[in-house]
């Protein structure tokens, strides 16, 4: 474990700015070696047509288990995230706001504020921990499928508002452009 090629984590998100650059480059090579199933890529590409020639603000607003899980960074509250979304949208005038959240109430509130400007993937959302129980057949597989699709779509936006999460970190890594983070 004392080898510099390992990163010991206490299960918090890793601050990639503190990783030795050589090690970080290896990490990026490993990420590039991952292959995403063709059906997931096709699903994301089909949805991505809504992004075509549009200025998109991506918002990844965690809820669910991140609010209660041990050692998870605590997410911003709704007032904080909506305030920054409004501020950035008023300044840059986006065509759409692409919201990724697993909380039913967050989606409902965003729809109330942004209406038809809001776009989102029709996927599982809950008012509880999304990992509690199995409300649909193949629930865990479908959560993974939807998460990867959302990650791919977030990687295609022009600007990204997010709290600390692995999904937003992977969207930044997966993005082929210099994704502007807010």
Model-based region annotation:
Residues 1-94:
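Secretory-pathway luminal glycosyltransferase catalytic domains
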Residues 95-181:
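Donor-binding and catalytic core of enzymes assembling or modifying cell-surface/extracellular glycoconjugates
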């Amino acid at each position: 474990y004392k080898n510099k090629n390992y990163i010991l984590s206490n299960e918090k998100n890793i601050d990639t700015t503190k990783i030795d650059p050589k090690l970080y480059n290896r990490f990026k090579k490993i990420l590039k070696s991952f292959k995403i199933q063709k059906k997931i890529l096709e699903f994301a590409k089909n949805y991505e047509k809504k992004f075509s020639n549009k200025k998109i603000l991506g918002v990844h607003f965690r809820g669910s288990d991140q609010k209660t899980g041990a050692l998870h960074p605590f997410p911003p509250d709704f007032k904080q995230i909506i305030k920054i979304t409004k501020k950035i949208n008023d300044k840059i005038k986006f065509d759409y706001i692409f919201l990724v959240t697993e909380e039913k109430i967050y989606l409902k509130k965003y729809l109330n504020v942004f209406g038809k400007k809001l776009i989102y993937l029709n996927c599982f959302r809950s008012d509880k921990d999304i990992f509690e129980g199995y409300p649909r057949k193949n629930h865990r597989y479908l959560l993974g499928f939807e998460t990867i699709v959302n990650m791919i779509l977030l990687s295609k936006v022009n600007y990204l508002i997010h709290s600390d999460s692995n999904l937003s970190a992977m969207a930044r890594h997966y993005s082929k452009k210099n994704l502007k983070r807010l």
